[in-house]
């Protein structure tokens, strides 16, 4: 149990470090042209309400990922549900579970940067600066590859099956749609 907790701490620190590095370029981001035409006063008085809605929405998708990993991906990769596995199988199940959450967390928390930086539809109507885009997608790429490396194995992660990425795409698209709805309600 203690070894697993120590590895989980390393996983969380690594996730936070890579995410923080991907955010370094935010001060050099583009601003939509309509914000440059005339000075605007920023009213942050209801920012708390926005955070109260956006924060828990992220947790909803974490829980969906947990359920996906526990009830679908884990049993399909390891051939059985968690409680029917031997000790070695349970350890592999935990490594797979952590890898799935690790990757999903990076994708959602990084892509939401692109969602909330503009009133427009990101990537279509408004694009982040090259440095922001480069660092955020590099962070996502690096973190997605870690479970497939020997380093990933050492910190308690294992490779994810291809079907995971189909589910991840659905989760990310739904999260981005919900973040867009919340953003539009806030901007009103």
Region annotations inferred by a language model:
Residues 1-121:
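Membrane-embedded transport module
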Residues 16, 70-78, 98-188:
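C-terminal transmembrane module of polytopic membrane proteins
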């Amino acid at each position: 149990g203690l070894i697993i907790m120590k590895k989980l701490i390393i996983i969380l620190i690594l996730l936070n470090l890579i995410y923080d590095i991907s955010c370094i370029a935010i001060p050099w981001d583009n601003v939509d042209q309509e914000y440059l035409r005339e000075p605007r006063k920023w009213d942050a008085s209801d920012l708390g309400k926005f955070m109260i809605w956006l924060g828990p929405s992220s947790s909803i998708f974490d829980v969906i990922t947990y359920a996906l990993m526990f009830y679908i991906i884990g049993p399909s990769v390891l051939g059985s549900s968690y409680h029917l596995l031997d000790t070695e199988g349970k350890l592999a199940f935990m490594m797979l579970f952590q890898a799935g959450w690790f990757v999903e967390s990076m994708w959602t928390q990084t892509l939401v940067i692109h969602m909330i930086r503009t009133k427009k539809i990101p990537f279509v109507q408004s694009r982040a600066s090259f440095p922001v885009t480069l660092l955020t997608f590099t962070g996502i790429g690096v973190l997605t590859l870690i479970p497939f490396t020997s380093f990933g194995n050492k910190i308690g992660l294992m490779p994810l099956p291809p079907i995971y990425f189909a589910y991840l795409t659905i989760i990310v698209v739904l999260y981005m749609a919900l973040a867009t709805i919340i953003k539009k309600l806030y901007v009103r």
